[in-house]
């Protein structure tokens, strides 16, 4: 996988006042879903050392023994107690440094997935947990496009009135990498299911309002594999 121009990504995120655009219905809903999921799993972090990979300076209200914020955008993390400016593709920590890891906000979609996941696994202790989220090519948003269901592809999208290039991965592509690095899937939670389809005929704002139905249909096999975004709870397996 080729690399994107990290300097452009870094410049953008250093410049914008906040990571989540308040006037963007789609990303506001994404932020809400991620925040809600993490709050449901707060018990994982009690008295643990946590890596917040690609944090943007957001600690999600987590109470833990110690949290390290890693991000390529220094402006977003410089006020955090423990921060390092780095890509998650090359983490400056020894092996098995952390009890748990958070990597959400589609951080993975700006990275070489193999390299990023291998690094997350490397710095995670055995039996440690990762909350990982990524954008999927199986999302209905890409229906009838060449990107739909592609194992790995590049897309250009608009965010905060600017064009951005990022990777898009199929779930199976990511799952194969996870298996290679001994990361077992404990939970899989898709979101942005229905609005990806409705956005083809309705406004984005109305589509997102109707996507509350996701909380029902995400458990139906025919729909759950078509989430535009997928949150995974992972555990690092013990390998003798």
Residue spans of the language-model regions?
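Class I SAM-dependent methyltransferase SAM/SAH-binding core
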Residues: 49-90
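A short SAM/SAH-binding and catalytic strip from SAM-dependent methyltransferases
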Residues: 100-114
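A short acidic, Gly/Pro-enriched loop at the edge of an enzyme's catalytic core
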Residues: 89-101
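Conserved class I S-adenosyl-L-methionine
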Residues: 1-44, 130-156
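A short glycine-rich, Lys/Arg-flanked "PGG" loop and its adjoining helix->strand segment in the class I
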Residues: 114-129
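A C-terminal cap/extension of S-adenosyl-L-methionine-dependent methyltransferases
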Residues: 187-240
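Acceptor-substrate binding/catalytic loop of class I
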Residues: 157-173
């Amino acid at each position: 996988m080729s690399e994107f121009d990290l300097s452009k990504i870094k410049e953008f995120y250093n410049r914008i006042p906040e990571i989540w655009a308040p006037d963007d219905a789609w990303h506001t809903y994404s932020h809400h879903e991620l925040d809600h999921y993490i709050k449901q799993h707060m018990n994982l972090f009690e008295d643990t050392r946590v890596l917040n990979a690609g944090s943007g300076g957001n600690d999600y209200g987590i109470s833990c023994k110690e949290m390290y914020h890693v991000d390529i955008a220094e402006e977003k993390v410089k006020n955090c107690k423990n921060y390092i400016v780095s890509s998650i593709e090359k983490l400056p920590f020894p092996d098995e440094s952390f009890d748990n890891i958070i990597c959400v906000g589609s951080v993975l979609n700006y990275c070489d997935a193999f390299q990023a996941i291998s690094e997350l696994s490397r710095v995670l202790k055995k039996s440690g947990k990762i909350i990982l989220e990524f954008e999927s090519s199986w999302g209905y948003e890409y229906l009838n496009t060449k990107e739909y269901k592609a194992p790995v592809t590049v897309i250009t999208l608009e965010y905060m009135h600017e064009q951005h290039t990022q990777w898009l991965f199929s779930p199976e592509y990511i799952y194969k990498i996870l298996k290679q690095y001994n990361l077992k899937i404990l939970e899989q939670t898709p979101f942005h299911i229905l609005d990806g389809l409705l956005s083809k005929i309705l406004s984005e704002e109305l589509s997102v309002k109707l996507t509350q139905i996701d909380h029902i249909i995400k458990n139906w096999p025919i729909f759950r594999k078509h989430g535009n975004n997928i949150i995974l709870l992972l555990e690092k397996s013990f390998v003798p």
